[in-house]
A protein has these predicted regions:
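Membrane-embedded and juxtamembrane structural elements of multi-pass membrane proteins
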Residues: 2-68, 85-231
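Membrane-interfacial helical/loop segments at transmembrane boundaries in membrane proteins
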Residues: 65-83
């Protein structure tokens, strides 16, 4: 297996087409009912991996292109004698900009998450013991081994789950019936059990790396929708 500029372009093209097809097929109720949501999520995972690992496999045959591809390569890697810096090529410049922007976007996403959680933690209050016990019972039913903490906040209008290692379910400060509480708690525990917060983190990193491809944002939006449907 090896990575070349051609294999990179090919994997981007195939993955982008796949994202668009999955997006439109997912909207078809018959398709979802027949193949199921887990199949769609699995196909999105394959798209993830293919774009992130643009290898040329030994069992594949490379299609020869003597018109478009050579022109692109010649334009991106011109004769170095024409430049003051011998190591300069347009390809190196594009790669440098790509990496620099990716690092900035990933750091910004991590910072925004950390800042949001820090603000939320300042507004939380301890719940009544019976509510924590109720959440513990739901978490046990969902077969979650780790402790799931319950916190209450006035600064949110809908439930929020955060914490990669020690999950916390944050409820808005309002009165819920037992049925409403159990329904919301089950939904949030489903996210915890399925490691959805890790999937969303990987999606943010993925979008940070491939920020120049508008279709990854379509994937992010649709994947988030699928994760909600799964719970």
């Amino acid at each position: 297996m090896q990575i070349s500029f051609y294999s990179f372009l090919f994997s981007i093209a195939i993955s982008s087409i796949f994202i668009v097809l999955l997006y439109f097929f997912r909207k078809k109720i018959a398709f979802c009912n027949h193949y199921g949501l887990y199949t769609i999520l699995g196909l999105y995972a394959v798209t993830f991996v293919r774009m992130a690992l643009p290898f040329e496999f030994g069992f594949t045959n490379t299609i020869s292109d003597h018109s478009f591809y050579p022109v692109v390569i010649d334009a991106l890697t011109p004769d170095k004698k024409n430049f003051f810096v011998p190591e300069f090529t347009w390809l190196n410049l594009i790669f440098t900009i790509w990496i620099a922007v990716s690092v900035i976007l990933i750091i910004r996403a991590i910072y925004k998450y950390h800042k949001a959680i820090k603000i939320l933690k300042k507004t939380v209050i301890e719940p009544k013991p019976e509510l924590q016990a109720q959440l513990d019972a739901v978490a046990k039913q969902c077969k979650i081994k780790s402790m799931v903490k319950l916190r209450i906040s006035d600064s949110i209008s809908s439930p929020v789950t955060y914490g990669f290692i020690k999950p916390v379910v944050l409820f808005s400060n309002q009165t819920f019936t037992n049925e409403e509480f159990n329904f919301i708690a089950t939904h949030e525990c489903c996210h915890i059990k399925n490691k959805d917060i890790w999937i969303k983190l990987l999606t943010e990193i993925y979008c940070g790396i491939f920020w120049w491809n508008p279709l990854v944002y379509l994937l992010k939006k649709d994947l988030s929708f699928c994760l909600e449907l799964r719970c």
